[in-house]
UniProtKB/Swiss-Prot annotation:
Gene name tied to this protein: JIP5
Entry's localization field: Nucleus, Nucleolus
Record-stated family: Belongs to the WD repeat WDR55 family.
WD repeats mapped onto the chain: 5-44, 104-142, 145-184, 189-228, 233-282
Biased composition (Basic and acidic residues): 390-405
Residue ranges with Low complexity bias: 358-367
Keywords: Nucleus, Repeat, WD repeat
Protein name: WD repeat-containing protein JIP5
One GO term describing the cellular component: nucleolus
Organism of provenance: Laccaria bicolor (strain S238N-H82 / ATCC MYA-4686)
Amino acid sequence: MPEIDVGSQIFDVVFHPTFATVYTGLLNGHVKAFAYNEQGKEQAAFSVRPSKRSCRGLSIKHDGTHLYAVGKAKALKYNFISGLIIRCSVIDTATAQISTRPGAHDSTINRVKYLMPWLISTGDDDGVIKLWDPRQQECVREYTQHFDYITDFLWLDDKKQLVATSGDGTLSVMDVRSKKPEPFAQSEDQDDELLSIVAIKGHSKIVVGTQLGILSIFNRSKGWGDCVDRVPGHPLSIDALCNLPPGLPNVDPTSTVLTGSSDGYVRAVQILPTKLLGVVADHGEWPIERIAVGGGWWVGSVGHEDLLRMTDLEGFFLDQSEDKELKGALGVTNENEQSDEDEEMDVLGNDAGHPEVDGSGSSSSGESSEDSEASDGETPQAKQRKRKIEQKPLDVDKPKGRNEIDVENAFFDEL
């Protein structure tokens, strides 16, 4: 796994849409670009510093000509007061020239998203979302439906809608064609911080990562009021989500996502039905903050460290397929695919006590009721089906830390 040492903690990472170049936004305010080859060997392309304060978010134009960077900075306005000014910088990716727009927000900007030609969006710590036309000095629209920080954006091009997730526990949908400052829709409070968002199944379903480690599934045809399914399994928060590029072998990119969790793992997870395909990258004790996929099927992941980790997705999925073929040739079965003789007894219709995570919500109980109705009129009882019960299908055994110890509960009873 190639690693690029950038010299400072990384807040965000994006890839050029056509060239083999990756961009990083750093804690020290630098934006560094690296060119890489098919073997993952990198070479520094350029380094600019739009601000002396941290660069929190990056987004790149569809043709790769401009890179948008946001963060926190101080500016001196004439000879008056030196105050907190939030900047939005535009970087020419060919010449590395910078144009800065001070005063874009009143608080730190966390996210920026290129939507379409002449329209970008920004979201800040106070939950304010603004739409910008780079040709104009002032924002074209401002939304204030959120009261906590904006965590992520998703652009739905078919309806020209911008979906934003927030730390206040809701997501909102804004129709950029409307001139109203109110959102088109807003979800109910999900009782959890919403941290990341991607679309699957041809943008018909939306996957949202939460602080409690649950993937919430929204169905666009059912409305935005509440999620239709919840997929547990991650032991800690899901801070980053990313789609897979088309053309990868042995995987359906329309139903598989990459998840970045605070436990330091980047996982490949199939949604509907839910299945852990494997651990793509391991950052050790460092939480995953951002994931991005670039040309050549490379995925870049960053955490609370100075390293950008590059992983070859094609090699990962080919290795997964070869492992399965080898086990099948040797007559070895996976733990999740053991024979009926080695699995625990689980009678259909008694699944309520042992729920399985299959991404289908209440469909399991519905199938159980149908089976029970069909068997009411039959005297002989149907053969009981045996299957293994998975409590945490997405959990991964984590090696014990250097200073970590095991303490029995009784130790705390005397305190």
